[in-house]
From Swiss-Prot:
Gene Ontology CC terms: ribonucleoprotein complex; ribosome
Subunit structure: Part of the 50S ribosomal subunit; part of the 5S rRNA/L5/L18/L25 subcomplex. Contacts the 5S rRNA. Binds to the 5S rRNA independently of L5 and L18.
Protein name in the entry: Large ribosomal subunit protein bL25
MF annotations from Gene Ontology: 5S rRNA binding; structural constituent of ribosome
InterPro entries in UniProt: Rbsml_bL25/Gln-tRNA_synth_N (IPR020056), Ribosomal_bL25/Gln-tRNA_synth (IPR011035), Ribosomal_bL25_short (IPR020055), Ribosomal_L25_dom (IPR029751)
Length: 101
């Protein structure tokens, strides 16, 4: 893949319910990896997530993830994609931070 992929995530509010997020155009996501002490709950824009899932190969394609709420930004891979089996809508994304971040 010649073009680079990027997505922006925001911290997920502690009281936010997944279905309410989806109704408001957001997808729950999580960021974890060897350089991150504990997993970080995020939300990403549904349309941006759909484009990312369409273009990225899970566990292979490097993606630039930025989180304006945190001083963290770096390269991740799309570790897991969860989708509704009948509706074919995204439910959850898991991002794995690469070790060099």
């Amino acid at each position: 893949m010649s073009r680079s992929l990027a997505i922006e995530g925001q911290l997920r509010p502690a009281d936010a319910k997944p279905n309410a997020l989806r109704r408001n155009g957001k997808i729950p996501a999580v960021l974890y990896g060897p350089t991150i002490e504990s997993s970080i709950s995020l939300v990403v824009d549904t349309r941006a997530a759909e484009l990312l899932v369409r273009d990225a190969r899970p566990q292979k394609t490097p993606i630039q993830l930025s989180i304006p709420d945190l001083p963290w930004q770096g390269t991740v891979v799309l570790q897991e994609v969860q989708a509704h089996p009948a509706k074919d809508t995204l439910y959850h994304l898991s991002f794995l931070a690469k070790a060099e971040n």
